[in-house]
């Protein structure tokens, strides 16, 4: 099949709509279930590139959770701790496969933003991954293949309307790509820049020690940024994004946004949060919303009389400001990536507040000396990659 008609474009009034191969070749994607739309395919094709590159760069299964053409989260398939399982709502005792761990981590980066996400897997979707997705609110998935039992589970989701796309893993896009804006065609070379350990050799700080785990986290952050709407900053820990700041005009606002998401990720692991007792039958999105309010300054919205009884089996204690500050101060070993240089040292100051110890950014600012000075003040290791990763 060379062309696929779509219901509409970005909005219902934008018709006609389709995807097609301009060179007359066959589409490298097959719809196995549902009727994916225009934005679904944008998410699918961007997220597939991300997980494919993560797989190639790390040698580990990878997954992403996309919303509006940017990743809410991305991760490689390292095992989950018992604390991870509680935070990510892994309710059963079944063994988790690496690809299932990758998606659970990717979605767990920012569960609020991943509501109604597009899932992407670097490897065949197995039954364990499909079972986890079955209980999440999601729009669709792309993968290079599906185990029969996994496909059966996914096809039953959303009363048979869940979008399932299979992509040819051997497909390679053309070297030159085109995009029309206001009737004018833009042409550029595809971004084939390779992100691997070779990119991390120019360490510009006094601290030259970048542990192997941090190098993997740098790779995860940079590949995630490669497919995130610019400007963008990404915080990573233990092989998973824990905060993505996307599409901000100001670099410091990217760093603050991603940092606040990383803080939320860490606060969800506070003993008071992991110990919350919810009423029977409450769905995961409602739990996510309740936790988000509980750890915020608006906690009265879920703790007031008449409110908490609808959510919790017993009234939780307030998670106070001092408790949150003390807990956040324990966050360490975080890696940060930026899709372009830091123009001021304030970005490093903000990163430090969320436990960042290693940074990867292109360098090239006229204030690089100031940025390095601030990193040195906190004993961080920072490398200049020389590679900008804008994505639009």
Predicted regions and their residues:
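Glycine- and Gly-Pro-enriched alpha-helical subdomains that act as flexible
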Residues: 72-112, 242-344
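Conserved helix-loop functional segments at active or binding sites
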Residues: 53, 227, 264-268, 353, ...
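Flexible, glycine/charged-enriched surface loops at secondary-structure junctions
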Residues: 57-65, 164-167, 230-237, 267-278, ...
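C-terminal binding/interaction regions
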Residues: 72, 117, 121-122, 135-165, ...
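Gly-rich Lys/Arg/Thr-decorated short loops/hinges at beta-loop-alpha junctions or inter-strand turns
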Residues: 23-35, 109-115, 189-208, 285-307, ...
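Alpha-helix N-cap/helix-initiation motif
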Residues: 36, 40, 214, 247, ...
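Nucleic-acid 5′ end/cap handling module spanning
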Residues: 220, 228, 235-238, 245, ...
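Active-site loops and adjacent core secondary-structure elements that bind or stabilize anionic groups
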Residues: 1-196, 214-232
């Amino acid at each position: 099949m060379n062309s696929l008609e779509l219901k509409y474009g970005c909005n219902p009034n934008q018709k006609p709509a389709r995807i097609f191969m301009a060179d007359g070749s066959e589409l490298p994607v097959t719809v196995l279930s549902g009727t994916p739309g225009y934005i679904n395919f944008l998410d699918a094709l961007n997220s597939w590139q991300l997980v494919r590159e993560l797989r190639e760069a790390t040698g580990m299964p990878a997954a992403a959770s996309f919303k509006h053409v940017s990743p809410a989260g991305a991760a490689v398939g390292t095992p989950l701790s018992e604390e991870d399982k509680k935070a990510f709502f892994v309710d059963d005792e079944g063994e988790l496969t690496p690809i299932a761990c990758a998606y659970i981590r990717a979605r767990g980066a920012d569960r609020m933003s991943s509501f109604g996400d597009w899932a992407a897997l670097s490897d065949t979707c197995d039954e364990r991954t499909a079972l986890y997705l079955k209980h999440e609110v999601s729009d669709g998935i792309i993968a290079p293949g599906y185990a029969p039992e996994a496909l059966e589970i996914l096809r039953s989701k959303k009363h048979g309307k869940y979008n399932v796309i299979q992509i040819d893993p051997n497909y390679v896009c053309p070297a030159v790509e085109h995009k029309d804006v206001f009737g004018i065609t833009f042409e550029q070379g595809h971004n084939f820049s390779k992100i691997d350990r070779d990119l991390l050799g120019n360490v510009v700080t006094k601290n030259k020690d970048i542990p192997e785990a941090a190098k993997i986290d740098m790779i995860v952050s940079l590949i995630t940024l490669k497919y995130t709407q610019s400007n963008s900053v990404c915080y990573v820990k233990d092989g998973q994004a824990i905060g993505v700041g996307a599409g901000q005009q100001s670099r410091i606002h990217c760093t603050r946004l991603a940092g606040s998401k990383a803080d939320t990720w860490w606060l969800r692991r506070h003993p008071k949060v992991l110990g919350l007792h919810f009423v029977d039958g409450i769905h995961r999105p409602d739990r996510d919303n309740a936790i988000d309010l509980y750890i915020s300054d608006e906690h009265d919205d879920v703790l007031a009389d008449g409110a908490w009884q609808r959510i919790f089996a017993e009234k939780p204690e307030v998670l106070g400001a001092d408790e949150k500050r003390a807990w956040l101060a324990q966050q360490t070993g975080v890696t940060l990536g930026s899709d372009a240089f830091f123009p001021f040292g304030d970005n490093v100051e903000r990163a430090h507040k969320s436990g960042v110890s290693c940074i990867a950014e292109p360098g090239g600012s006229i204030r690089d000396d100031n940025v390095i000075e601030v990193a040195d003040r906190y004993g961080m290791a920072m490398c200049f990659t020389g590679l900008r990763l804008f994505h639009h």
